[in-house]
Every structure is written in structure tokens, then in C-alpha cells.
Amino acid sequence: MTGTFITFEGPDGAGKTSVLKTLIPQLEQHVRVPLHLTREPGGAKISETIREVILDPANTAMDARTEALLYAASRRQHLVEVIQPALAQGDIVVCDRFVDSSVAYQGGGREIGPDAVLKMNQFATAGLEPALTLYLDVPVQVGLDRIKSHQNERQYDRLDQESLAFHERVHDAYMTLIVDNPQRIVSIDATEPLEKVVAACFQTITRRFPELFN
């Protein structure tokens, strides 16, 4: 039996962490099979070690392609250790970021090119794609303003040093992904109050996978 792989994407400040913190317990109350929440970069011991290297603010000399390769390496290990075993058991895996993040941040933001980053990650994942991706959409400046307003509540990382232009390129790359993958990616208006965003995510998942729910 093959499980169900769902990913969450969005620009910085979209509120994925807050949404998932509320959404996951709601899903767990209604689904028929075990549900696993994980994240990228990270999600497994080796992957978390790579995450620390990627996000360390001291690593300002990191080359864009080095960064992209590290994300892909972290993803591969996470896939082998966590995602694939859970899916093989028929479970649900919900992942905070996956390949789309690399395409947007390194392909778009770092200007490596979406196609090059996608090919790199297709090798890392052996072509595994989510069955559904929920994209939490907020205007770039709104997301950055949210980050600033919560700067005392979150750990500062290397991506926080990036310019507005970088984040605009990331957003543009995400918009292209949505257009190119209309069956897989569903855009959710994340400027709405948290309860409405969570409700929209819950409804999208239940409509797409009614067989998973009691």
C-alpha cells in the first residue's frame, strides 16, 4: 500500500508553522491512518546537521550551488530515513517544504535557474512528488513585515539577510510553479485570519482525499 504525501509551501512569513501547529491535531482526530509531520531542511539526524550548516548566519561565503546541493543532500537523507518508510506503510506524511522550496529559493531567489535545481532534486528524490501541495500565499512585504514583528520569537538565520529583490524572485518562482502544476498545487490566501487559513487547508485535504477520513 502506498501512503499519501502532502507538502506545505510558502514564502518567508506565510505562517506555515502556525497553520500546521493548529491543523495537524485536527487532521489526526479524523484520519484513518497514522499521520507524520516533518520538515525540510531537516527531519532526520543527518539532515538536521546539514540544516545547521545551510542556515548558519556565519556562512556568508556559501556559494549558491553549494547551498542548492546541500538542500538536495539533506532532502535525500530525509526521504530515505523518514518519508519513504512512512509512505511504504500506507501512512500520511505532511512535510513543511519540499522540492518546490529549492526551485523557488535557489532556482529563483539565487538565480541558478528552476530547471537546473529541479533536475538536481529529481535525482535526489528519484522523482517522488507530493500528491498535494498547499501553497500559503502572502505578498512579499507582508511576509517580511510578519517576520520583523516576530523577530524575538524566532531564530535568526542566513536567509534573513537577503534583500527584498531576492524574496520577490522567490515569490515569482512560486507563482510559475503554481501555473505549471495546477493539479498538484492549491494556493491558499494566507492573509486571512489563522482560523480561516487552517479551515481552508483542512477542507482542501478532505476534498482531495475523502478515503482517508472517518
Curated annotation (Swiss-Prot):
EC number annotated for this UniProt entry: 2.7.4.9
UniProt keyword list: ATP-binding, Kinase, Nucleotide biosynthesis, Nucleotide-binding, Transferase
Gene Ontology cellular-component terms listed: cytosol
GO molecular function annotations of the record: ATP binding; dTMP kinase activity
GO-annotated biological processes: dTDP biosynthetic process; dTTP biosynthetic process; dUDP biosynthetic process
Pfam families reported in the protein's UniProt record: Thymidylate_kin (PF02223)
Catalysed reactions, semicolon-separated: dTMP + ATP = dTDP + ADP
Chain sites annotated for binding ATP: G10, P11, D12, G13, A14, G15, K16, T17
Family: Belongs to the thymidylate kinase family.
Protein role: Phosphorylation of dTMP to form dTDP in both de novo and salvage pathways of dTTP synthesis.
Record protein name field: Thymidylate kinase
Organism: Lacticaseibacillus paracasei (strain ATCC 334 / BCRC 17002 / CCUG 31169 / CIP 107868 / KCTC 3260 / NRRL B-441)
